[in-house]
């Protein structure tokens, strides 16, 4: 249970970005899915850039929820690490901007991840977040659609470039993102397990 219920009745819109950041840092590690859904308007007041996600119909067979509800599920599914939860909260921030419809009325979000990375960094920078956190969230948001393959040489290169902790967090974000869309296929589950095993091996 987070401190979200205690904020009811307060004028959150009058808070400075730094004050909103401090509140969210106190909330995110322990917030539940139920709270994220019940207090969705409150969350979107604390992060106004999330407002377009409220009720946003993704028009896709790959998504069973509106955009905000999907984001809420992802936040609740990743571990309670603060930086990882910030990345989960902002991972699809680029979707409303990237959204297009094809001739059959299906929604597409081409390039939303690399578009969203800098957007997430801008949000956190305006809130006064530490630069290390800004950089990590930017990496995770930008890369959350990149396929992690169980190829030890490639994973080793990725780890050497970004660090084992960052790549481990990326895997956690991708797993949560996939789970929130429905039951992952057998191939996806096996791939995630294989990647996790290689990352565990690289720790030694």
Region spans (language model):
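Divalent metal-dependent catalytic cores for phosphoryl transfer on phosphate-bearing substrates
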Residues: 75-183
């Amino acid at each position: 249970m987070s401190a979200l219920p205690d904020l009811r009745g307060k004028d959150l819109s009058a808070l400075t970005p730094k004050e909103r950041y401090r509140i969210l840092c106190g909330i995110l590690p322990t917030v539940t899915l139920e709270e994220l859904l019940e207090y969705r308007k409150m969350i979107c007041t604390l992060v106004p850039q999330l407002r377009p996600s409220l009720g946003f119909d993704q028009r896709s067979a790959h998504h069973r929820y509106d955009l905000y509800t999907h984001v809420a599920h992802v936040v609740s599914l990743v571990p309670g690490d603060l930086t990882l939860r910030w990345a989960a909260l902002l991972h699809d921030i680029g979707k409303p901007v990237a959204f297009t419809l094809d001739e059959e009325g299906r929604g597409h979000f081409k390039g939303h991840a690399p578009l969203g990375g800098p957007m997430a960094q801008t949000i956190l920078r305006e809130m006064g977040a530490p630069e290390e956190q800004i950089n990590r969230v930017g990496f995770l948001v930008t890369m959350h659609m990149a396929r992690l393959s169980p190829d030890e040489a490639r994973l080793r290169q990725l780890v050497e470039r970004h660090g084992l902790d960052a790549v481990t967090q990326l895997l956690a974000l991708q797993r949560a993102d996939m789970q929130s869309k429905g039951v992952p296929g057998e191939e996806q589950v096996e791939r995630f397990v294989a990647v996790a095993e290689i990352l565990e091996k690289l720790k030694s």
